[in-house]
Amino acid sequence: MSKVLEQKQQVVAEVAAKLRDSKSTVIVDYRGLNVAQVTELRKQLREAGVEYKVYKNTLVRRATAEAGLTGLDEHLVGPTAIAFGVDDVIAPAKVLNEFAKNNEALTIKTGVIEGNISTADEVKALAELPSREGLLSMLANVLQAPVRQFALAAKAVAEQKEEQGA
């Protein structure tokens, strides 16, 4: 086997493994972004713990077939970059969606969220969700609200009794 073929097979295996292992994957069209914009995007994604890489579409097609993800081939046209989120489901979608709002040249094509192929609209909807920490704080506030209201009511009753007694 030639070295080039071996390298391509390694890339296909690498992409297939990343597709299987990542919690969410977002595929974008980066056509029209200049070097400074791409550098800024990569920096933001790196800070969020997201891997961002450009692969040849033919190699990604083979990797999606190897990973068992059919239905992505139609989106693998033109300049395509892939963002892999291993730890956080929302991070790739959130960073790319925010960047796309400020830079019209970047468009979200599709995504794979926990093994399910998603449309661009579904990826954008996922990006609008609060982070895990935000959701946990909302849950804590909801759970604390009845206790807080009871404490305020008990305090009001105590103050009322104190006024009547005085």
From Swiss-Prot:
Protein species of origin: Shouchella clausii (strain KSM-K16) (Alkalihalobacillus clausii)
Subunit note: Part of the ribosomal stalk of the 50S ribosomal subunit. The N-terminus interacts with L11 and the large rRNA to form the base of the stalk. The C-terminus forms an elongated spine to which L12 dimers bind in a sequential fashion forming a multimeric L10(L12)X complex.
Record-stated family: Belongs to the universal ribosomal protein uL10 family.
Keywords (A to Z) from UniProt: Ribonucleoprotein, Ribosomal protein, RNA-binding, rRNA-binding
Entry GO MF terms: large ribosomal subunit rRNA binding; structural constituent of ribosome
Superkingdom of the organism of origin: Bacteria
Gene that encodes the chain: rplJ
Pfam families documented for this protein: Ribosomal_L10
UniProt xrefs under InterPro entries: Ribosomal_uL10, Ribosomal_uL10-like_sf, Ribosomal_uL10_bac, Ribosomal_uL10_bac_type, Ribosomal_uL10_CS_bac
One example of a Gene Ontology biological process annotation: translation
Protein name: Large ribosomal subunit protein uL10
Gene3D superfamilies: 3.30.70.1730
Function: Forms part of the ribosomal stalk, playing a central role in the interaction of the ribosome with GTP-bound translation factors.
GO CC term (a single one): large ribosomal subunit
